[in-house]
């Protein structure tokens, strides 16, 4: 299944369907869920990153339970905006995941999403390192998905 842009994904969603945002890290995948009006992204949880088939099965379960009609994954562009090896690996992973889950997918620039979330948790929430580690993945997914929703709002 090819990747789509955010406008195409929004156009493919059925009535009352949501988007599931993914922030894939080395150890975990942060998850965020949009509301059905596609205006608000909320942190949803995190999955342990492992075999693609296991991750895909869990995302299929979440999608069925939550009425998800599309996936949006973070795209780790280089700081200068170029498409480097990390972005290519993320793109390849997302195409494979989309095919296994059976949902259309888009990617969205995630540069500095984890940094922004960490900074907020340190400065504004005054959280410990351990508590930040528990939250950062799903909050980064929410931050990324909210950016995608805001940029493509109609």
Swiss-Prot record:
Keywords: Cytoplasm, Hydrolase, Nuclease, Ribosome biogenesis. GO terms for molecular function: nuclease activity. It is an enzyme of class 3 (hydrolase). One of its GO terms (biological process) is rRNA 5'-end processing. Its main location: cytoplasm. Belongs to the YqgF nuclease family. This is Putative pre-16S rRNA nuclease. It comes from Gluconacetobacter diazotrophicus (strain ATCC 49037 / DSM 5601 / CCUG 37298 / CIP 103539 / LMG 7603 / PAl5). The lineage of its organism: Bacteria, Pseudomonadati, Pseudomonadota, Alphaproteobacteria, Acetobacterales.
């Amino acid at each position: 299944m090819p990747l789509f842009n955010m406008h195409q994904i929004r156009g493919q969603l059925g009535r009352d369907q949501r988007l599931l945002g993914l922030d894939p890290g080395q150890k975990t995948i942060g998850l965020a869920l949009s509301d059905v009006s596609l205006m608000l992204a909320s942190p949803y949880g995190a999955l342990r990153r492992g075999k693609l088939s296991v991750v895909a099965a869990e995302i299929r379960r979440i999608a069925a339970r939550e009425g998800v009609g599309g996936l949006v994954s973070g795209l780790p562009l280089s700081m200068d905006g170029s498409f480097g090896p990390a972005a290519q690996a993320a793109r390849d992973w997302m195409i494979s995941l989309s095919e296994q889950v059976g949902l259309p997918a888009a990617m969205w620039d995630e540069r500095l999403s984890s940094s922004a979330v960490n900074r907020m948790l340190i400065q504004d929430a005054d959280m410990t390192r351990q508590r930040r580690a528990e939250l950062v993945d799903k909050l980064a997914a929410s931050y990324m998905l909210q950016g995608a929703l805001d940029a493509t709002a109609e």
